Swiss-Prot record:
One of its GO terms (biological process) is protein refolding. One of its GO terms (cellular component) is cytoplasm. The lineage of its organism: Bacteria, Pseudomonadati, Pseudomonadota, Gammaproteobacteria, Pseudomonadales. Its EC number is 5.6.1.7. Forms a cylinder of 14 subunits composed of two heptameric rings stacked back-to-back. Interacts with the co-chaperonin GroES. It comes from Pseudomonas paraeruginosa (strain DSM 24068 / PA7). This is Chaperonin GroEL. Pfam families: Cpn60_TCP1.
Length: 547
């Protein structure tokens, strides 16, 4: 085990504070409408340019182990805020820096760190409750666009496209962000249920110009196993041929003789048919087949429930208005399922989303929910260069998280004003002793930090602006983009309540822990001696005759 270095008291806290300030100073330069960019060096390829707080924080690693601990703890604040609300990372970092700086001053003056922390915690609970009261529901497209615009660093086109996407696919819908190929942002919406499985044979294609197989008013056969024997399928194929309707087969796989027979029947025009693999794997595949069955009013042919392929009839088949299959995707449009069954399935999936602890499972369940209840929208980000594209894509993703948070918990006035207004919650708040009162007062000052930083980044005098905003009431605040005072909500400067709340909670939690630090332990870095040079090879005698 390597030897460790231990620092105590003030010397430990001073080192930690250096790390906190280095990281926070780099991150806070990006805050507000006039925040600057940060350039991040990459070991390969072009540098990344970003205004995203958490991206900057993740890149910072300091040489001194003790300073680095401070930096890593603040990085954790940004990550926590990002995980909770998907945005507000810079605000959280600025708040944490203010809490730690104010707190360590009080500790140096001889205050008890544990009581300071209790005071901070008390004040945080009161401010969070006040923020929830200040929040107004965010339902209309205009408010959603404004939230998206602010989060995307005042880029109106991004706010607009996100609001449009949300309007089209609803609150339950899935919105994904991809890199586009043009200069402009594009929005495409997939109607119906789409899953990432294409046709099993190109011979099913009946639209050569788009290389797609389109089936109008098809029947759907859903099978939870591999089909390789055509004999099992003959009864259902004959029934479909008599009905004179196209057939889509969704199975674990269709191979060998069964696939060849389907292709021949399709080419001869006996039965218009197409086959695709079922989406997902394992238990998720079963669940998705069941989703398709409920959406189309069919039944999954599975031996688990005592149904065999030979015994399948037209009653077991699902119905849809149209199915489009290309090389990669299958889209089922207007399934004929019973609305009450679909709603019951949606409720069941929502319950699973609440109960799951895995982020991956939650994401997959959300996708299933969107396919049943809403739809899927894809925002393709356009830019002139790859560097700009990456920076813009990160902003679109941030804005998307912010708008989702706004729909969830409502909006508050932006520009750091909500936190200043929430201070009224701790006007008469008293702790159990004088030191807790100092903790409450300390948070009162720290909460002004985001507004001060936004103003400083815009080149104005923070103290003057904070004083004027405090004299106002309600939504009155300072628009740093234009330098005008007024009603923040009317000016379209909104923040999601969830983002502001998560930022404060993350900052107070980790800031409080840092104040109460008394000792720090780190490994001693040993300077390894340089490697010795190569030994002398001596003369290459005896080679003279080779000329």
């Amino acid at each position: 085990m390597a030897a460790k270095e231990v620092k105590f008291g003030d010397s430990a806290r001073k080192k930690m504070l250096v790390g906190v300030n280095v990281l926070a100073d780099a991150v806070k330069a990006t805050l507000g409408p006039k925040g600057r960019n940060v350039v991040l060096d990459k070991s390969f390829g072009a540098p990344t340019i970003t205004k995203d707080g958490v991206s900057v924080a993740k890149e910072i690693e300091l040489k001194d182990k003790f300073e680095n601990m401070g930096a890593q703890l603040v990085k954790d604040v940004a990550s926590k805020a990002n995980d909770a609300a998907g945005d507000g990372t810079t605000t959280a970092t600025v708040l944490a820096q203010a809490i730690v700086n104010e707190g360590l001053k009080a500790v140096a003056a001889g205050m008890n760190p544990m009581d300071l922390k209790r005071g901070i915690d008390k004040a945080t609970v009161a401010i969070v409750a006040q923020l929830k009261e200040l929040a107004k529901p965010c339902a209309d497209t205009k408010a959603i666009a404004q939230v998206g615009t602010i989060s995307a660093n005042s880029d109106e086109s991004i706010g607009q496209i996100i609001a449009e996407a949300m309007e089209k696919v609803g609150k339950e819908g899935v919105i994904t962000v991809e890199e586009g190929s043009g200069l402009e942002n594009e929005l495409s919406v997939v109607e119906g249920m789409q899953f990432d499985r294409g046709y099993l044979s190109p011979y099913f294609v009946n639209k050569p110009d788009t290389m797609a197989a389109e089936l109008d008013s098809p029947l759907l056969l859903l099978v939870d196993k591999k089909i390789s024997n055509i004999r099992e399928m003959l009864p259902v194929l004959e029934a479909v041929a008599k009905a004179g309707r196209p057939l889509l087969i969704v199975a674990e796989d269709v191979e060998g003789e069964a696939l060849a027979t389907l292709v021949v029947n399709n080419m001869r025009g006996i039965v218009k048919v197409a086959a695709v693999k079922a989406p997902g794997f394992g238990d998720r595949r079963k669940a998705m087949l069941q989703d398709i069955a409920i959406l189309t009013g069919g039944t999954v042919i599975s031996e688990e429930v005592g149904l065999s392929l030979e015994g399948a009839t037209l009653e077991h088949l699902g119905n849809a208005k149209r199915v489009v299959i290309n090389k990669e995707n299958t889209t089922i449009i207007d399934g004929a399922g019973v609305q009450a069954d679909i709603e019951a399935r949606v409720l069941q999936i929502r319950k699973q989303i609440e109960e799951t602890t895995s982020d991956y499972d939650r994401e997959k369940l959300q996708e299933r929910l969107a396919k049943l209840a809403g739809g899927v929208a894809v925002i393709k980000v356009g830019a002139a260069t790859e560097v700009e594209m990456k920076e813009k894509k990160a902003r679109v993703e941030d804005a998307l998280h912010a708008t989702r948070a706004a729909v969830e918990e409502g909006v508050v006035p932006g520009g750091g004003v909500a936190l200043v207004r929430a201070l009224q919650a701790i006007e008469g708040l008293k702790g159990d002793n004088e030191e807790q009162n100092v903790g409450i007062a300390l948070l009162r000052r720290a909460v002004e930090a985001p507004l001060r930083q936004i103003v400083a980044n815009a080149g104005d005098e923070p103290s003057v602006v904070v004083d004027k905003v405090k004299q106002g009431s309600g939504n009155y605040g300072f628009n740093a983009a234009t330098g005008v005072y007024g009603d923040m909500i009317e000016m379209g400067i909104l923040d999601p309540a969830k983002v502001t709340r998560s930022a404060l909670q993350a900052a107070a939690s980790i800031g409080g822990l840092m104040i109460t630090t008394e000792a720090m332990v780190a490994e001693i870095v040993e300077d390894k001696p340089a490697m010795g040079g190569m030994p002398d090879m001596g003369g290459m005698g005896g080679m003279g005759g080779m000329m």
